[in-house]
Swiss-Prot record:
Binds 1 [4Fe-4S] cluster. The cluster is coordinated with 3 cysteines and an exchangeable S-adenosyl-L-methionine. Binds 1 [2Fe-2S] cluster. The cluster is coordinated with 3 cysteines and 1 arginine. [4Fe-4S] cluster binds at residues 71, 75, 78. It comes from Bacillus cereus (strain B4264). Belongs to the radical SAM superfamily. Biotin synthase family. One of its GO terms (biological process) is biotin biosynthetic process. The lineage of its organism: Bacteria, Bacillati, Bacillota, Bacilli, Bacillales. The gene is bioB. It is an enzyme of class 2 (transferase). This is Biotin synthase.
Length: 332
């Protein structure tokens, strides 16, 4: 005789989280394994937590790819890696003027955070100074928050970025420690954690998340959320694999739109006070249920990603307005 699974009271679990009672790994796995018919109840419960901490505000972030391709690392998901055969634009560093122009475009797109991203294993000191020159001008002429994602950092470089006024440093964990060797062989999971810690020690707010759909188990997905809690990432980008043609993960498809919603909800339950961002792969993986994702997440990228296209900013603004939510705009 088939055993009937007892339905969870997701709202009660959410109110427990609001009262600062942490959920267990078993609770997180239960969210991920819940029947698809429960997803709206789960998202409604996640919204209780999201609304308690962030109300109806949605943070917008814009990326500029300041150096594309030419990366010596062999990350299997990445179109910019040395082993990728993806037909992407490849170019060396943009000028400081172009980086500053991008900041003003971010404001036009109603973004509050401007993300300066460069491919590569780690920046040279000269490259860090190049970024710092642009950062200082952006800080003098706008009220944007600035995030940098430049690869591995040493302590001196992290300190210089902090001194220049960089608010946040992004360095994703990408996948579970157990799964890391199957994704990349040119650096380790611990290398990535080390850079997150160096940024934090320098006084920069750490931004770190993962790419879901790269062969990790359900249990590992839950453990990633708790690892991000452990390292105290202030901002958590949830990326969903875009299996780019020409990369080793080409054609891999593990996630349904409902799976993605469950990941976002689980991340909100585990990290209730943190900025949860629906990041790369949003349009491709969530498709028509993108708006529902914002009942758990409180942040998105506006415009294009590093090498893949996003939807038009007007579509994102409209989606947010249709939900009755509000853009947390940059103060001009």
């Amino acid at each position: 005789m088939k055993q009937v699974q007892t339905k969870r009271d997701w709202k009660k679990l959410a109110y427990d989280v609001v009262e600062e009672k942490m959920i267990t790994k078993e609770d997180a796995i239960a969210i991920l394994e819940a029947d698809d018919t429960e997803v709206l109840e789960i998202m409604n419960a996640a919204y209780i937590i999201r609304h308690h901490h962030f109300g109806k505000k949605v943070k917008l972030n814009m990326i500029i790819n300041t150096k594309s391709g030419l990366c010596p690392e062999d990350c299997g998901y990445c179109s910019q890696s040395i082993i990728s055969e993806a037909p992407i634009d490849k170019y060396a560093w943009l000028t400081q003027e172009k980086i500053v122009e991008g900041a003003h475009e971010a404001i036009r797109r109603k973004a509050g955070t401007y993300c300066i991203v460069a491919s590569g294993r780690r920046p040279t000191d000269k490259e860090v100074n190049h970024v710092i020159g642009a950062v200082k001008e952006i800080r003098e002429t706008t009220d944007l928050k600035i995030c940098c994602c430049l690869g591995f950092l040493n302590e001196d470089q992290a300190g210089l970025l902090a001194e220049a006024g960089v608010h946040r440093y992004n360095h994703n964990l990408n996948t579970h420690a157990n799964n890391y060797d199957s994704i990349c062989s040119t650096h380790t999971y611990d290398d990535r954690v080390d850079t997150v810690q160096k940024a934090k020690q320098a006084g920069i707010s750490p931004c770190s998340g993962a790419i879901f759909g790269m062969g990790e188990t359900i249990e590992e997905r839950a453990e990633i959320a708790f690892e991000l809690q452990r390292i105290d990432a202030d901002s958590i980008p949830c990326n969903f694999l875009v299996a780019v043609k020409g990369t080793p993960l080409e054609g891999q498809k593990e996630l349904t739109p409902v799976d993605c919603l469950k990941v976002l909800a689980m991340m909100r339950f585990v990290n209730p006070t943190k900025e949860i961002r629906i990041s790369g792969g949003r349009e491709i993986n969530l498709r028509s249920v993108q708006p529902i994702g914002l009942f758990a997440a409180n942040s998105i990228f506006v415009g294009d990603y590093l090498t893949t296209a996003g939807q038009e900013p007007t579509a994102d603004w409209g989606m947010i307005a249709d939900l009755g939510f509000e853009i947390e705009e940059c103060a001009l």
